[in-house]
C-alpha cells in the first residue's frame, strides 16, 4: 500500500504543477489590479528629461485629466507604443512621460527618433517614482483625473486596437 502511494506521488505533484502553470498562463497581465486606483498620485519632485535644472512635482497632475506613461529607451515595446501615444496626444489629453531607469541622453535620442507625445517628461533614473506607483515593467500607463486621483492603469503597451478603450476610460472621468 505504501509503495503504491509513493509511486503515485510524482504523478500528483505533476498534476499540481500543471494546474498552477495553466492558471498562471491564462491570466491577462494587463488586467493587474493596482493598489493606486482611487488613490492620489504619490508626491514627488523630479527633474524633467529635457532640462536637469527644471523640476516638476505632483501638482502637474492636477487641474486636468492626464495620461502618465512610464517608458524607457531600452524598452522595445515602448517603441511600438509611440504611434498610439502620439494619436492619444492629438485628442486633447495632457500626456506626461516618466523616463524610467534610463540615461538622459538615450531618453532624449529615443524621443527624437520615435516622436514626442508628452508635454512633460519626468526623469526618474533611479526608478524611485516608478517604485512608488507600483511599476512592474515598462511600458505602463496611468489615467489621473483632474483632482490628481489615479483612475485607471494599463500594464503593457497600448496597441492600436486599445486606443479607443483608453479614450473610453478618459471620457468616464472628464
State the predicted function of each range.
Residues 25-27, 47-54, 76, 121-124:
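Short gly/ser/thr-rich secondary-structure transition/capping motifs
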Residues 1-47, 174:
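N-terminal targeting signals for export/organelle localization
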Residues 79-115, 125-131:
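Structural microenvironment flanking redox-active thiols in thiol-disulfide oxidoreductases
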Residues 67-69, 97, 143:
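Hydrophobic beta-strand core positions in alpha/beta domains
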Residues 64-66, 70-74, 137:
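Short pre-active-site segment immediately N-terminal to redox-active cysteine/selenocysteine motifs
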Residues 44-67:
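A short beta-strand-turn-helix
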Residues 112-117, 124-171:
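Thiol/disulfide oxidoreductase modules built on the thioredoxin-like
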Residues 73-80, 140:
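C-type cytochrome heme c attachment motif
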